[in-house]
Amino acid sequence: MAYFLEQTDSEIFELIFEEYKRQNEHLEMIASENYTFASVMEAMGSVLTNKYAEGYPNKRYYGGCEVVDKIESLAIERAKKLFNCQFANVQAHSGSQANNAVYHALLKPYDKILGMDLSCGGHLTHGAKVSLTGKHYQSFSYGVNLDGYIDYEEALKIAQSVKPEIIVCGFSAYPREIDFKKFREIADEVGALLLGDIAHVAGLVVAGEHAHPFPHCHVVSSTTHKTLRGPRGGLILTNDEEIAAKIDKAIFPGTQGGPLMHAIAAKAVGFKENLKPEFKAYAQLVKSNMQVLAKALQEKNHKLVSGGTSNHLLLMDFLDKPYSGKDADIALGNAGITVNKNTIPGETRSPFVTSGIRIGSAALSARGMGAKEFEIIGNKISDILNDINNVSLQLHVKEELKAMASQFPVYQQPIF
C-alpha cells in the first residue's frame, strides 16, 4: 500500500512519513489523542471504504450488503459485551455526532440541556453557546467548587430551577471521576434523562478503572479512540429499548446518511482488543503513570486543578503565573512535548490564550512508557516552565526526550 502511494502521490506520502517521524520523536501528551492498534489501521484502509450501506443490518436501502451486515452486527455485539449493555449503535462518525444524535432523538427544538460549563471542563456539545447544541436548545451549565471538583449541590439547584429535559455528565478536561449515581439522583429529582458522555474515560470504564455509567445513565455516548485506542469514531449505548429505537432513527436518517463501513469494521477490531486481558493492564498503566506525573509536578510546586488527578489527565493551573497556557504549550512543543492550552476554572484569559494546559498519559502508556519515564517527563516539564523563555534549554530537552522516545517506537513500520 505504501508503495502505491509513494508512486502516485509522493507529496502526501512524504507528509505522512513526516508525521510518522513526528509521532515517534515527540512525546504525545494531548489527553484526547492515542496511538491506535495497527490492526485497526489495516481495517480502516480496506476495501470496505468502497461500500455504501444506508440503513442497518438486514434493513439496508442498498444491495450487496451481506458481508457488511455481518461486520456491523459483529461490531454491535462486541460493543454490547464490552460495555455490558443491551443496545449499541456503532454508526456515529464522531463523538460530537453521537451527542447530537442523542439530542435529536430525545429532545424537541428549544428543550433544555444542563451540562458542564466549558471553562470547568465541559465539551462544546454539552450546550456551549457557540455550538449547535447551544443554538437549537436552551442550554444551562453547572461548574466546579473552589477545590476543582464538580459542585453537585449547585448542579441540583440549577436543575431544580430550570427543569432540563436532559442532563449531561461528562467532560473533555476534568481530572476527577464522575459520580454517575449522584447525577442520576439529580436527574430523577427533576424528571430529566441522563446522558453519560464517557468519550475520555471509556477505556478506563471498560477496564474497571473508572466508575461505570450503567445502570445510572439512560443513554451513554463515547468516542472509540482516546483511551479505547480504536479508530476515530462515535458510539451510543443504552439499556432502554425505546430509547435505542429513537437513537437508530436519529442517526439514520436523522443526522447521517451512509455509515462508514471501514470505520465500523475498525471499531469491531478495536472492541476485540479492548476485551483482552492485556487492555486492563494498559488502563491500569494509564492511571498509574498519570499519578507519577502529577506527583513529580507537585513536588516541584506546580499547581494542579483539583489538587491532582483520578483519571488519565491533569490540568496545570497558571492563574498566578506571568505566562499563559499558550506560552506553556509553545515552550513544551519546542521541547518535543505535545500538550494543549486549556481554559481552567476561574479563567481570566481568553480561550485562545488560557491559564492552563491539559496533559494526558494514554498515548505514551500505549508506547510502553512507565513510572521511570513519566517521572523524567514531569521533571523536564518543570524545568521548561521554570525557565519558559530559554529556547536553548527547550532544544536541549528536545534532544534528550527524542533519545528516550526512540526506545519506545510507535509502530514497527511507518505506513499501514
Curated annotation (Swiss-Prot):
Q: Where is this site: Plays an important role in substrate specificity?
A: 225
Q: At what positions is N6-(pyridoxal phosphate)lysine found?
A: 226
Q: What is this protein called?
A: Serine hydroxymethyltransferase
Tell me what reaction this enzyme catalyses.
Answer: (6R)-5,10-methylene-5,6,7,8-tetrahydrofolate + glycine + H2O = (6S)-5,6,7,8-tetrahydrofolate + L-serine
Q: What is its EC number?
A: 2.1.2.1
Q: Return the broad EC class.
A: transferase
Question: Which segments of the protein form a coiled coil according to its record?
Answer: none
Cofactor(s) needed for function: pyridoxal 5'-phosphate
> Keywords assigned by UniProt?
Amino-acid biosynthesis, Cytoplasm, One-carbon metabolism, Pyridoxal phosphate, Transferase
Question: What's an example Gene Ontology biological process for this entry?
Answer: tetrahydrofolate interconversion
Query: Partners and quaternary state?
Result: Homodimer.
Presence of keyword Amino-acid biosynthesis: yes
Q: Which domain of life is it from?
A: Bacteria
Sum up the protein's function in the record's words: Catalyzes the reversible interconversion of serine and glycine with tetrahydrofolate (THF) serving as the one-carbon carrier. This reaction serves as the major source of one-carbon groups required for the biosynthesis of purines, thymidylate, methionine, and other important biomolecules. Also exhibits THF-independent aldolase activity toward beta-hydroxyamino acids, producing glycine and aldehydes, via a retro-aldol mechanism.
Supply the SUPFAM superfamilies for this chain. Answer: PLP-dependent transferases
Q: Does the keyword Ribonucleoprotein apply?
A: no
Organism, scientific name: Helicobacter pylori (strain Shi470)
Q: Which residues bind (6S)-5,6,7,8-tetrahydrofolate?
A: 118, 122-124, 242, 350-352
Gene3D superfamilies linked to this entry: Aspartate Aminotransferase, domain 1, Type I PLP-dependent aspartate aminotransferase-like (Major domain)
Q: Name one GO cellular component term.
A: cytosol
Please give the InterPro entries that the UniProt record associates with this protein.
PyrdxlP-dep_Trfase (IPR015424), PyrdxlP-dep_Trfase_major (IPR015421), PyrdxlP-dep_Trfase_small (IPR015422), Ser_HO-MeTrfase (IPR001085), Ser_HO-MeTrfase-like (IPR049943), Ser_HO-MeTrfase_PLP_BS (IPR019798), SHMT-like_dom (IPR039429)
Q: What is its main location?
A: cytoplasm
Family according to the record: Belongs to the SHMT family.
